[in-house]
């Protein structure tokens, strides 16, 4: 895939659209309880990008931020509720984008399972991926 290529994405209702410039920094499944609850899923697949490679195309008045914990926030659409983004002090200069909100494919497949100590037993796991407990 072409480095510096831009790919688009957005929320379920289309009120918020964005573009991210490749390359991505990483891609991983997050099993933490907050991600599971924010998305109503067994885990969430995130792709990390440099923050200055994220461009909001439309919906700045629809994109809202929820402080999910000290030093972390989640971006969602105020119309449809889609959680699309995550930023944290722990990863300065990065914007994490929920892979399911990106239209098409990015430049890599998931490489790891993060916060694996919190995974749910009913979700099948790709055991070939690297595992991180936190």
Kindly give the residue locations of the regions a language model identified.
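A short Gly-Trp-Pro
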Residues: 1-134
């Amino acid at each position: 895939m072409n480095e510096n290529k831009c790919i688009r994405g957005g929320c379920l209702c289309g009120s918020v659209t964005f573009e991210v410039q490749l390359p991505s920094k990483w891609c991983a499944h997050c099993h933490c309880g907050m991600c599971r609850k924010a998305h109503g899923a067994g885990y969430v697949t995130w792709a990390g990008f440099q923050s200055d490679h994220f461009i909001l195309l439309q919906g700045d008045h629809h994109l809202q931020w929820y402080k999910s914990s000290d030093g972390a926030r989640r971006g969602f659409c105020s119309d449809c509720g889609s959680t699309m983004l995550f930023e944290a002090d722990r990863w300065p200069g990065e914007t994490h984008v929920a892979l399911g909100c990106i239209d098409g494919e990015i430049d890599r497949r998931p490489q790891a399972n993060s916060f694996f100590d919190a995974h749910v037993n009913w979700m099948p796991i790709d055991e070939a991926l690297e595992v991180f407990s936190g």
